[in-house]
Amino acid sequence: MEEDEPMGGGESEPEQRKSGTPRLYIKELVMRNFKSYAGEQRVGPFHKSFSAVVGPNGSGKSNVIDAMLFVFGKRAKQMRLNKVSELIHNSTNHQNLDSAGVSVQFEEIIDLENGLYETVPGSDFMITRVAFRDNSSKYYINERSSNFTEVTKKLKGKGVDLDNNRFLILQGEVEQISLMKPKAQGPHDEGFLEYLEDIIGTNKYVEKIDELNKQLETLNESRSGVVQMVKLAEKERDNLEGLKDEAETYMLKELSHLKWQEKATKMAYEDTVAKITEQRDSLQNLENSLKDERVKMDESNEELKKFESVHEKHKKRQEVLDNELRACKEKFKEFERQDVKHREDLKHVKQKIKKLEDKLEKDSSKIGDMTKESEDSSNLIPKLQENIPKLQKVLLDEEKKLEEIKAIAKVETEGYRSELTKIRAELEPWEKDLIVHRGKLDVASSESELLSKKHEAALKAFTDAQKQLSDISTRKKEKAAATTSWKADIKKKKQEAIEARKVEEESLKEQETLVPQEQAAREKVAELKSAMNSEKSQNEVLKAVLRAKENNQIEGIYGRMGDLGAIDAKYDVAISTACAGLDYIVVETTSSAQACVELLRKGNLGFATFMILEKQTDHIHKLKEKVKTPEDVPRLFDLVRVKDERMKLAFYAALGNTVVAKDLDQATRIAYGGNREFRRVVALDGALFEKSGTMSGGGGKARGGRMGTSIRATGVSGEAVANAENELSKIVDMLNNIREKVGNAVRQYRAAENEVSGLEMELAKSQREIESLNSEHNYLEKQLASLEAASQPKTDEIDRLKELKKIISKEEKEIENLEKGSKQLKDKLQTNIENAGGEKLKGQKAKVEKIQTDIDKNNTEINRCNVQIETNQKLIKKLTKGIEEATREKERLEGEKENLHVTFKDITQKAFEIQETYKKTQQLIDEHKDVLTGAKSDYENLKKSVDELKASRVDAEFKVQDMKKKYNELEMREKGYKKKLNDLQIAFTKHMEQIQKDLVDPDKLQATLMDNNLNEACDLKRALEMVALLEAQLKELNPNLDSIAEYRSKVELYNGRVDELNSVTQERDDTRKQYDELRKRRLDEFMAGFNTISLKLKEMYQMITLGGDAELELVDSLDPFSEGVVFSVRPPKKSWKNIANLSGGEKTLSSLALVFALHHYKPTPLYVMDEIDAALDFKNVSIVGHYVKDRTKDAQFIIISLRNNMFELADRLVGIYKTDNCTKSITINPGSFAVCQKTPA
């Protein structure tokens, strides 16, 4: 088993004893295209103790250390390159590679006593870093992607010092140690001091110590400024001490004034309490009486509310019924309109049906007549045709007989007969033509007659329609006139209703206007009565003075100051609080005031304070001055309104430049601001700041009412009360008239609305009739055109008639010509023939002629019947078509008529129901009107009684108010005295506190408090005289009261500055303590490490040099950090020298001794050194090599060396060589070779 391999678990080997804790070591290094290493090259495995990397110069030995630096996260410049991408291998055979990577395999082991070791299971791990062409790189731990932070954290956790890199000694670093200065010369330099502090770890205190040092300097500067401020405050305090003493004298005088005020107020308070007791009894009796009246009033109000509720209930019910009745009317009107419309529609339909029935009957009759006539003609024609042969046969027989007769008279008649036969033969065509023309004449005459009758019938229908249109137009005009009249009436009645409602609304508005006036008038009467009674019971002092004024007993009296001015209600509380002089009596001269005082004294009426105007003339110029107030707040004086301009003097004397603030915050700012002229400030809520700085107000209800919003009248006369009562009476009469006017207007518009309702129903009915007439008129107008067209023969018919007339005329002329042409010949010959045969022949001829005539008639009749049949067939066809159309129209109208009957029935039923509802509603309204009238009467009567009770109660209340006012005045006076006593006591207490606070002379204070005059009994007058005397004395004094506050402020400022100085001093001391503690901790830790390292350095140097000496020395022994550390060395058999003055080899030995001492002070599991023996001779290399060999027992050393007496001591040799510009590696275990060499021996 090899020495560097872990101990196996075989049973044949004895159990090994562990000799240490786990430590980290580098097992193997794998490089891929890194610097001079092409492809994947494995360097190692390294020995757990001492591995030497050997190889010729330029082969790539130092790249092994660069590979480790690369994995440990060092930048390219630390590996003698500019960019990371330059780490990628680049040689002739390996160009344009994408990346370079290095993997370092670590493992934790536990050293055993016999040189073997045991691997800690699961402790191995591999760190890899790969560099790319884009100068980026990536980290991996066990092939898992990682980052620089995680890598460094893991290595630090295993004991590798990556912060100071003391485990790495690169090529040339040993010599750099010898070149170090005792201390860094700049922020980026490193000297021996910084080098040692990095190892010892005291450099962590440097930044904090520097920061505390800066804080300490800042605090010292701040403290110097505060010291100057304290001295300045002390000087200002001493300057104010004299003014303070003067103010203290004034304050003692003011203390005495407060005591006398307290005594006078107490006496006035006791007198007021006695008067209050007397007034309370009188008020109690009057309130009891008023309470009884209020009980009655409450009962009456309750009853009135009930009556009002009942009245309102009935009124609402009446409105509901009226609305229902109005709705019924509207519905009934609508049904009436529908009824009229349906009646007219039904009438119109019936007329149409009747006309159609008449037409059908007439046309049916015509068809019947024509059919019968055609049948008769059809039946007659066969008979006539049958008679003709018979008559012809008879004619032949008769002609034979005639021939026989003629034969007898043949001779005579032969000539005539021959001529007649000849004539007959000539006339036979004529006869035939005559028969034809007669037939044509008969046909044309019949057709002409039929056409004429048709035109006459159509003309008659057209004339009848025109007449109906005329009648309808007349009726429409009549209805339109009636409608216009009704509309005018409706408009008139509606206007009357509107005017009545307008009168009602205007009257109600007047009533609404007058009701408050009535109430105000009643209150005014009660107020005047109360004021008159109040004046009778006015304050006896003021009353006596005003009486003297009215009687001209004393001249120059104006009255109570509060009654001589007015102010907005907003400032009532403010002026009532801030102006104590509102109860003063204003007089013109001193003599007037003395006269008043004498009057009160003689009557033993009490005391009063007077404002003498002639004493206030020095304020006149101030009245005209324009002042600029702080924050533009108003002065109370400017807000007061007066009738007499002279009264402004009095108000200015009482108020001065007192200003009004909107709230306490603003008042505080102004009162304690820089403008002393406006130090007296009152807030709207009554908080008052005096010039002395004291504040009063708050804690209870704000006092107000000492000045009105209008200037009060001097008195109330009986005449004024009578005038107010007359005014009230007029308003009451006007109200009664207006209420009567409202009632009349209501009755008037209701009557007008009822008439409008009836007229609207008639108007609707008339409008429906007009609509029906319009409909019938429109129908007739539409028919009239067709009737007119029918009455006007058609062009073809006219042409036909003309043609028929021509035919008739022509045929008549032809017949006449034919008859004329044959008649003479026939008649002459016939006469001759007849005369020739005698009478017998004549008779026979007549008979023959008659038969011939009958035959001719039959032929004519047959022709006429045929024409008649043909004409009748045409007319029957036309009439049949008209009957069919008329029948269909009649059926439609019958359906419409039936629908109208159904709708009419429904309308009638609904209208009946509405009418019944209307009747019931009207009945309910009539019944309810009586109830409403009764309820209204009861309500108004009771309201009148309640109003009278209210007026009586108001009078009583005003009396109570007057008495209460007087009582309240006494109470207010009592409270005022009480409050004043409390205020005086508070002021006294505050004054005492202020005096004690200001350290006033105790003997003077005791003498003031024990004044014999204060303790002696006296009357109120004596006390007031003392108060007045002290006030006068105080006025004569003119101390700067602000000086006390300023002195106190300066004392407080001085104390505050002292406190601030103490605070700053304490903060500085705390910072200095922290600063000193950190410096001491740094010094102690540094010296402890320094001494340890120095001793180890001495030991290491003696061991390496075999007799030399070396030590670290402080340039400044008192402060090692001020000048730094020097490295002194005494080589063997030489004197002490600074390391910088040694030879190259001596510098290397000294530096290595220091490095080894530092390693001993802070050991790490790994040490990597690059040619540390380069400058040493053979002997010293051997000494260093054996020391390293000894140190590798508990640490891993990887040393690059070219000295055989160094690398021959190594446990493993890693050979580095280069071929084809590519570095390769081979690892050799020297121990194995040694075994092989021993085996043959």
From Swiss-Prot:
Its Gene Ontology biological processes?
cell division; embryo development ending in seed dormancy; meiotic cell cycle; mitotic chromosome condensation; mitotic sister chromatid segregation
What are the alphabetically sorted keywords of the record? Acetylation, ATP-binding, Cell cycle, Cell division, Coiled coil, DNA condensation, Meiosis, Mitosis, Nucleotide-binding, Nucleus
The keyword Disulfide bond appears for this protein = no
In which compartments does the protein localize?
Answer: Nucleus
- Tell me the superkingdom of the source: Eukaryota
Task: Locate the region Disordered.
Answer: 1-22
Q: Where does ATP bind?
A: 55-62
Q: What sequence ranges are listed for the domain Zinc-hook? A: 25-1224
Keyword Protein biosynthesis recorded: no
Q: How does it assemble?
A: Forms a heterodimer with a SMC2 subfamily member. Component of the condensin complex, which contains the SMC2 and SMC4 heterodimer, and three non SMC subunits that probably regulate the complex: CAPH, CAPD2 and CAPG.
Name assigned to this protein: Structural maintenance of chromosomes protein 4
The organism is Arabidopsis thaliana (Mouse-ear cress)
